[in-house]
């Protein structure tokens, strides 16, 4: 999909770049698969900010995605490819032969009219979902489960994919795009192919207001704050951060400091993303 530039009628239009999506459905989404969702503004139930830089944005309705793909041995036809405001990937509306409809993450190359199916022994074909134990080594997959029947958790964003590199006993070894090598139970399901809309990272919003439409608020440097607001704040004129190491507003080291503490799953990581 090519990028489109605009006539520079304003600074925002001059800098903007959009991905051309001619095959995306222009009408309304399937009403039965929509749910309402309210904005949190990054606040928890106490009203305190727990996630910064969140607030405002256009109203959105959540599209219910079938991450489990547990409707086995029943063929489905792709009715259309749609835009989803809640994720970077596009979604595909499926219609099963029994009349049921559902949304899935749209793989790269999937188009209207294609037939897909899920099950333990289905063909290795784009969009089909099956357990890792039945997928040939070297296959590129996406929407991978971390626990059997829990639903896809890995490789769901635009352009992402995972490669099945080995299978030994009850485990399958996956190579992630980050370079991490990870073991997953071979009973976990995955979908053949990689996620579509792979040029999403090439788009340019063009102006700050476009970011606000997405519900993202500005990020203020700690050095521009007062000492009461941030450890880097204060000082005369444009002073530096003043700390020997950069920290978060709560004093936790940042910019490279490792914060992952999950010994339970560490045993499944063969090689970390940092080598």
Curated annotation (Swiss-Prot):
Region (Disordered) residue spans: 227-261
GO molecular function: rRNA binding; structural constituent of ribosome; transferase activity
PROSITE patterns from the UniProt entry: RIBOSOMAL_L2
Keyword RNA-binding on entry: yes
Disulfide topology: none
One Gene Ontology term, aspect cellular component: large ribosomal subunit
Oligomeric form and interacting partners: Part of the 50S ribosomal subunit. Forms a bridge to the 30S subunit in the 70S ribosome.
HAMAP family, per the entry: Ribosomal_uL2_B
Function: One of the primary rRNA binding proteins. Required for association of the 30S and 50S subunits to form the 70S ribosome, for tRNA binding and peptide bond formation. It has been suggested to have peptidyltransferase activity; this is somewhat controversial. Makes several contacts with the 16S rRNA in the 70S ribosome.
Protein name: Large ribosomal subunit protein uL2
Gene that this sequence comes from: rplB
């Amino acid at each position: 999909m090519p990028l489109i530039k605009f006539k520079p009628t304003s600074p925002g239009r001059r800098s903007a770049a959009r991905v051309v999506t001619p095959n995306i459905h222009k009408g309304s989404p399937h009403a039965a698969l929509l749910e309402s969702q309210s904005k949190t503004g990054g606040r928890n139930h106490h009203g305190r900010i727990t996630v910064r830089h969140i607030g405002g944005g256009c109203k959105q309705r959540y599209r219910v995605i079938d991450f489990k793909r547990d409707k086995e041995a029943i063929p489905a036809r792709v009715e259309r490819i749609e835009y989803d405001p809640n994720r970077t990937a596009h979604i595909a509306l499926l219609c099963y032969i029994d009349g049921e409809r559902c949304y899935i993450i749209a793989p790269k190359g999937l188009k209207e009219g294609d037939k897909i199916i899920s099950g333990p022994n289905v063909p290795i074909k784009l969009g089909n979902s099956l357990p890792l134990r039945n997928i040939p080594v070297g296959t590129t997959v996406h929407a991978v489960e971390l626990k059997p029947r829990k639903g896809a958790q890995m490789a769901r964003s635009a352009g992402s994919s995972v490669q099945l590199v080995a299978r030994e006993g009850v485990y399958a070894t996956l190579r992630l795009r980050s370079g991490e090598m990870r073991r997953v139970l071979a009973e976990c399901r995955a979908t053949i192919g990689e996620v579509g809309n792979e040029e999403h990272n090439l788009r340019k919003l063009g102006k700050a207001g476009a970011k606000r439409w997405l519900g993202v608020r500005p990020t203020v440097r700690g050095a521009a704050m007062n000492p009461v607001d941030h450890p880097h704040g204060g000082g005369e004129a444009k002073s530096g951060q003043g700390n020997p190491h950069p920290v978060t507003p709560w004093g936790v080291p940042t910019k490279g400091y490792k914060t992952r503490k999950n010994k339970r799953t560490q045993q499944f990581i063969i090689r970390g993303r940092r080598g």
